[in-house]
């Protein structure tokens, strides 16, 4: 397993997000440090996905900023992105490519070095042994979600994981597989920011929740 890169504090400072005439959240500040798990809660439409996209630098806040190690992520850009894995609620898989091919491309784009054996092992870790090679269009929704999440099995060295509804479409065994990966990452000093409607406890030592309702 690769050594974890240094985790610099992730800070959200006075964030405000507006959609149309509606303010989703405002005055939102928090800090995520290595070894911590932070769940973002709130009702549908409260801005959970927008917040994660802001944290990743994929969406500009209407006010405030996100910092990594005290520096604005807008200035750091690629340097910050190289230290993060973001898995959105959409799987972002190419239907005409296999799970193995999709994972290989995702790793290459993220700068994660992984050979065919490691890719196969990562997919097996998520319960896709024997399903590595069919095109993704032939997989069930749960299998597609597992294929997307297999990046986590190869991302032990990447300090920050940002996960939007990672347990969607997963059966109980797959949920436990993903929870185990998250627990392991946090125990090694990584940080995880995530949303979920799944109520089972991940069981990390340092776990917090921020609810967007009323911000």
What positions do the PLM features span?
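The feature captures the beta-strand-to-loop junction immediately N-terminal to the Walker
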Residues: 41-43
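Q-loop/switch helix immediately C-terminal to the Walker
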Residues: 90, 95-111
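Catalytic Walker B motif of ABC-type/P-loop ATPase nucleotide-binding domains
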Residues: 161-165
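Conserved structural motif at the start of ABC-family nucleotide-binding domains
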Residues: 10, 25-27
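Helix-to-loop junction immediately C-terminal to a conserved catalytic motif
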Residues: 56
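Conserved ABC ATPase signature
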Residues: 96, 135-142
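Conserved ABC transporter NBD signature motif
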Residues: 64-75, 79-80
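Conserved ABC ATPase "signature" region
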Residues: 104, 116-131
């Amino acid at each position: 397993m690769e050594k974890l890169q240094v985790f610099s504090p992730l800070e959200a400072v006075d964030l405000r997000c507006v959609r149309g005439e509606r303010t989703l959240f405002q005055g939102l500040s928090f800090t995520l440090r290595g070894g911590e798990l932070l769940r973002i809660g709130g009702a549908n439409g409260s801005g959970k996905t927008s917040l994660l996209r802001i944290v990743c630098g994929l969406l500009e806040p209407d006010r405030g900023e996100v910092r990594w190690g005290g520096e604005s992520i807008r200035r750091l850009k690629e340097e910050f992105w190289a230290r993060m894995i973001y898995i959105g609620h959409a799987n972002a898989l190419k239907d005409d490519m296999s799970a193995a091919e999709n994972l290989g491309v995702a790793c290459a784009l993220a700068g994660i070095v992984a050979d065919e054996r490691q890719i196969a092992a990562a997919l097996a870790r998520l319960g896709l042994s024997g399903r590595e090679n069919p095109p993704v269009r032939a997989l069930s929704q749960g299998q597609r979600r597992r294929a997307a999440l297999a990046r986590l099995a190869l991302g032990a060295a990447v300090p920050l994981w940002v996960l939007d509804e990672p347990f969607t479409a997963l059966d109980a065994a797959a949920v436990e597989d993903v929870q185990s990966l998250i627990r392991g990452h946090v125990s090694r000093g990584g940080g995880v920011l995530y949303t979920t409607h799944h109520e089972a406890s991940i069981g990390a030592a340092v776990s917090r929740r921020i609810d967007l309702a009323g911000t």
